[in-house]
Amino acid sequence: MGLLVGISMLYFAANDWTQENLGLSGFSIRGISAWALSGEPNSTVIMVAAIALFIASIGKSGQFPLHTWLPDAMAGPTPVSSLLHSSTMVVAGVFLVARLYPVFFVGLDILGSGGNLIMFIGAITIVISAALAFVQNDIKRVLAYSTVSQLGYMMLGLGAGAWLPAVFHIFTHAFFKACLFLGAGSISHSASHHSFDMKRDMGGLRKVMPITFTTWIISTLALCGVFPFSGFFSKDEIIDNVGNNGYNTFMIVGLVGAFMTAAYMTRATYLTFFGEPRGASAGHSSHESHGAHGSHDTHGTHGDHDAHASHDAHASHGPHESGLLITAPLMILSVLALGSGLLNATPFGESWERMKLWVEPRAVEVVDSTFPGGPGESLFINVPSAEEGS
């Protein structure tokens, strides 16, 4: 409903202006963004439209208070969760705000006050979701609440005017969160008999699953924003930009959220890979009973026993490393979780800011005589191609 109301308001408010001045439809993102920055919009209309669109974004990206649905959407296969919760479905709301940023920039007076709706919702989501992640025993629910918290960082950055770091965090988050979800799937497949309960069926897996463990640690460090992993160059950049733009209270919230992220991921890592094996990871499962049936088979029906052994190799071998089909994506994603931050390594200087050249929109000639200057002036025109940015 929020999306429908927001789109309708923008179309009817901007259509005449965009067609007259730019020859574009009122549904054109370029036209709407240009209209938002032109000084023409009625302040009430653009504010209500921005709020309506943001309500839609809250629902789509699982922000507070509509954050509870996302962890419940874990019933599907882990590769599906990996795609949907790292880089595709749930970031759509954040991308909507980023893509129509001039509407929010003007409508919610970003950088013009002590805070705005986007920042408040993002900050609340960061803390609440991190706290909920800390008390989960299901490893996929930990990662789901972690995703909600990271989406809160993206929203906080957009609300504070840190457009590029927020968009860059979408990029880096895709790699390390996908790796973490697939790591959880690897554990479920090869160690815990398809259980995701860390307390009941995991523990002590670091030695029997070295590849899964190593890739998990790399992605965890990226999620926690540890240098030189990719999260340092995106999430920490958001926190730094929030502080530099004068929102010190929100910067503190971001720092608290970073410590909470480290806390719940340390807990999840310890319960999964350290300590004594528990439950399925210790070899305790209903599959053990099949061995007894085999010992009572005195009539030479070895075919049934062989069929069962081939049917459930996991039970006979106990916890073990997953095959190449599972570990190869983990290794690829872990490399990207480590190195993708270098595409916009702001602390190293402007020559390292490649992502800025590729995705930051630029103004073209038409704006010179039509639009006033100011922050965000260039955000409505074409995104340059990689060739133009090279």
Where are these regions (language model features)?
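...captures the hydrophobic TM-helix bundle architecture rather than a specific catalytic motif
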Residues: 1-349, 369, 373, 378-390
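Membrane-proximal cytoplasmic C-terminal regulatory module of class A 7TM GPCRs
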Residues: 349-368
